Amino acid sequence: MPSLASIVSRMRIAVFCSSSPTIDNKYVELAYELGKGIATSSNELVTGGGHISMMGAVSRGARDAGGKTIGVIPQALVDIEFADHDNDELHVVETMGQRKHMITDISDAFVTLPGGAGTLEEF
């Protein structure tokens, strides 16, 4: 039987957070550090697949620490060059609803960082 530590260390952790370019930089730094922490704990990061603000920072933090990143993004956001193509996996879906559904389906745990109405709507 696997140990609890080995099970926990293989989790996919979804992070919901702001993608606004106007959010206070202290939150962007917080997201980056969380991404690093997820990766150094041998977990995988799941995000909404964007490259800016907190969403981009959490992924950069995970990658900088050698972690795996998985993004899920609607085609409409890919079309406006919002996608983080540096993700190890980038799943493109049709709608925001499909994005939420896939993120919740593939993730084992969830973290919510500061954000606005879009972050709140994730729940």
Model-identified regions with their sequence ranges:
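Short, well-ordered secondary-structure micro-motifs
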Residues: 26, 57, 81-83, 102, ...
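Short glycine-rich anion-binding loops that position phosphate/pyrophosphate groups of nucleotides
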Residues: 18-21, 51, 75-77, 109, ...
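N-terminal alpha/beta PP-like core and its mobile active-site loop of ThDP/TPP-dependent enzymes
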Residues: 22, 26, 83, 94, ...
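Active-site/ligand-binding-proximal alpha/beta "capping" segment
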Residues: 98-123
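Glycine-rich beta-alpha loop segments
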Residues: 2-68
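Structured loop/turn residues at beta-strand edges in well-structured enzyme cores
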Residues: 8, 85, 105
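Short, well-ordered alpha-helix to beta-strand connector turns
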Residues: 42, 87-88, 107
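Glycine-rich, small/polar surface segments that engage phosphate groups of diverse ligands
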Residues: 47-96
